[in-house]
Design a protein with these regions (language model features):
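Core dinuclear metal-dependent hydrolase active-site scaffold
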Residues: 1-36, 87-142, 154-159, 205-213
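A short helix->loop->beta-strand "cap" motif at the edges of active sites that frequently abuts
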Residues: 62-66, 167-171, 198-200
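Binuclear metal-ion centers of metallo-dependent hydrolases, dominated by the metallo-beta-lactamase
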Residues: 4, 79-93, 97, 161, ...
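Hydrophobic/aromatic beta-strand patches that form the interior of the parallel beta-sheet core
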Residues: 42, 69, 86, 102, ...
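Active-site metal-binding motif and surrounding structural segment of the metallo-beta-lactamase
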Residues: 27-70, 144-147
Length: 213
């Protein structure tokens, strides 16, 4: 399976010629095109940097085979589209094209006590790649590649260290890094990796670049 990183939290997985898009947010200008070409779009939660409602709606209109999965708030904003848009929650599992997906988690990490928490789910794809959305979700199953959030109003370096240790992946890739400069990304990778307090390498993957996972 091939993983291509796009801006911030958006990733595309490719297997056997089919693609799956996770979190096409407004920081990803090519999100509508990526979603239109995919067999499925997975959304972790409703925040704009993870879910560009206009882009996903346009993709649904352009590709009548596209399916979208996410928390109930995603269905509320998009509509059901004859069942192609459906809500998922922790414990769900489904297959779409060559992708097997398991769903974990319930809530977005706390940003501040004055801000209500919302639903957030994480996705494990083909038993290999885990996208936690905006939470330090520990799936409790083996993970080959962890997509590791490294910046944002809810993140904590101390919690991130403990998170990587708890998940214990073979490899990690930085996501949710739009608030960091290049130097900040390098610092996060070093601190969260084996040269710092983390157990595994944390890769910086520039937007548009791909790796095999």
């Amino acid at each position: 399976m091939e993983l291509t990183k796009y801006n911030h939290a958006t990733v595309v997985l490719e297997q056997d010629g089919a693609t799956l898009v996770i979190d096409p947010g407004t920081f990803t200008p090519e999100g509508a095109d990526l979603a239109t070409a995919a067999v499925a779009v997975l959304v972790t939660h409703e925040h704009f940097d993870h879910f560009d409602v206009d882009a996903v709606r346009a993709a649904l209109d352009a590709n009548d085979a596209l399916v979208v999965r996410g928390p109930a708030a995603i269905v509320d904003q998009l509509g059901a589209h004859d069942g192609r848009v459906a809500a998922v929650s922790a414990g769900d599992a489904f297959e779409v094209g060559p992708f097997s997906v398991q769903v974990f988690g319930e809530e977005h990490a706390v940003i501040h006590g004055d801000i209500p928490t919302i639903a957030n789910v994480g996705y494990l794809v083909n038993g290999a790649v885990f996208h936690p959305g905006d939470a330090y979700l520990v799936p409790g199953v083996p993970v080959r590649t962890l997509l590791l959030p490294t910046s944002g109003p809810w993140t904590s370096t101390a919690e991130a260290v403990d998170y990587v240790r708890a998940v214990s992946p073979e490899h990690a890739v930085q996501i949710h890094e739009a608030m960091l400069s290049e130097l900040g990304q390098q610092s996060a990778a070093r601190f969260l990796g084996p040269d710092g307090l983390g157990p595994v390498p944390v890769q910086i993957l520039p937007a548009g670049e791909s790796i095999t996972v």
